[in-house]
From Swiss-Prot:
Entry text on domains: The RNA-binding motif binds to the RRE, a stem-and-loop structure present in incompletely spliced viral pre-mRNAs. This region also contains the NLS which mediates nuclear localization. These overlapping functions prevent Rev bound to RRE from undesirable return to the nucleus. When Rev binds the RRE, the NLS becomes masked while the NES remains accessible.
Record-given protein name: Protein Rev
Assembly and oligomerization: Homomultimer; when bound to the RRE. Multimeric assembly is essential for activity.
One term of GO molecular function: RNA binding
Taxonomic lineage from the root: Viruses, Riboviria, Pararnavirae, Artverviricota, Revtraviricetes
Segments for region (Homomultimerization): 14-23
Amino acid sequence: MSSTEEELRRRLRLIHFLHQTTDPYPQGPGTANQRRRRRRRWRQRWQQILALADRIYSFPDPPVDTPLDLAIQQLQGLAIEELPDPPTSAPEPLNDVAKSP
């Protein structure tokens, strides 16, 4: 097996691992709002995983003469991050427009 095929197999195994370690599709009790919120959070995590898998698949192979530390630093940028909560209030310019008739 050539090195490119081996690299492709390694990347595909990593992507498969990402898909296996994610949370399953949410099911269970709760109000309609709670179920909607759980599905929305699950969809957001799933979109992050798909984007991460795409970046892993399309990530260029590091040149052979590149130090391993540099390649590791580049790969550390590929991470799933928690999404911030949406703001609870409107920005100031929008508040001023809403108050004045």
